Each structure stands twice: as C-alpha cells, then as structure tokens.
Amino acid sequence: MKIYHFGAEDAPVLLLLPGTCCHWKSNFGAVIPLLADSFRVLCVSYDGFDETEQTEFPTMLEETEKIEAYLKTHCGGHIRAAYGCSLGGSFVGLLAARQNIHMDYGILGSSDLDQASPLTASLQTDFLLPLIYPVVRDGKFKAKFLQKRLDKCAKESGDYVKAFLKMFGDARPYVTMQSCKNQFYSDLITPLPDKIHVPGTEIHIFYALKMGAKYRARYQQHFAHPVLHEQNLQHEELLACHPEQWAHLVKSIAL
C-alpha cells in the first residue's frame, strides 16, 4: 500500500480512499488540485492496485490496519477528514467504528455498504469477477456483446458512464485477479457495526437518490447520526461529473 500526498504539510489532513478496483489517480486526479490549496491531501493506493508495487490486496481489516498505522505515524493518529468513494466508504466506516485513529469528519460517497454471508459473498464474487476483471486488466469487457452494450449505454446516458469509466481507470495488467477477488469478497463479509457513534466525529454521506430509497435506511442503520446530503444523481456522479461542486461540498463540511 502506498500513500500519495499533496498540499502544505501543516494544512488539515484529508484522506482520500478509492472505490472498488479503482486507480487512485483516475479516481481522484481531477479533484486533488481543487483540494490541495486547503488540505494536506493523502490519497491511498491499495495493496494490489499500485503499479509501483508487486502486492496483492489482502482483506479489508488488514488494509484498515495499515491505514491506521500510517496515520498514527505520520499524522499523530488524528486527521481532519476522510472521504471514501464507494468501497472507500466502507473503510471510512471501519476507521470510525474501530476508533484506533480519530477523524473529525467521515464522508461516504454514495457507498452501498452491501454485506453478505460468506457463501453468498463467494457466489456473488465468482459471478462478477469474470465480467469485471477483464475491464481492470485490459480496459474493456472480454465479451464483445457486453462491450457493445456498454458503448451503447455510454452514448445514451451522456457524460455519466464515460466519466465513471474514466474514474475507474485504464487498462492495468499489473492488477491480479486475486486482488480483485479479495477486495470484492472481503468487503462483502466484513461486518460494519450498527449505530456507529464516535464523540467528536461527524459522519456525512453523499446520498445519490437515484441509487434507491433503501440506502437511506441502510445509512441510518449503520450510523447513529449521519448527515445526509441528498443529490438527485447516480452512484458517485457528483465526483465523476461535477468535480468542482464535489470539492466545494467537501470543503464546506471539513473547513
């Protein structure tokens, strides 16, 4: 795992946590310059997903422990805020629940927080991985009909699908199937406690309403007092398509 840092050393720390199988620069490259004038930006590059290392993603808890160890060593165990994109929101929840480091603000970016039994998680992972992994490795679907369907969807949906795929990243042949499998599976089976409440920590959630009404209940299940920022958008559409608005909202919360 690597941590890339930007901005002044004495500025308040903002931790950025990428989404599922995303490359850190593709995920956050457009917004880091918008944040680095106000924060010391730390962007996590997970084990198995950084081109400068030969590693594999272990488990959510092992990766969380590495993040905590870094923050204790380099930030005194206290940061201003953490933003988690999709899967990264699970890390924000775990960091809050474990209370091994302290963050003043935890922000989840329309995370689904899906959880499943080991059997169900294994079945879901085994079904999705052959579809998703070629996109990670080669930058496109292996099945031609899926690629054609995606291309058609991208044309019909305007900027969102193109922006989302760009955020996902280009072809990355260095990422192993095992890393993707471990990340998918581990995220599903790692429990996130209910009614998380940490004195001195505010939880904010960018709630993409087009994902569905069930997520409101899910956010309120896992967090005792979440502040929901409702947006009539799709999953992580604010970050993918409106980086300036996204950065403004993050600053309005954490500054």
Report residues per predicted region:
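Conserved HGGG/HGGXW glycine-rich cap/lid loop of the alpha/beta-hydrolase fold
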Residues: Y4-E53
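Active-site loop/oxyanion-hole signature of alpha/beta-hydrolase fold enzymes
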Residues: L42-A81
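Catalytic histidine-centered segment of alpha/beta-hydrolase-like enzymes
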Residues: L233-Q245
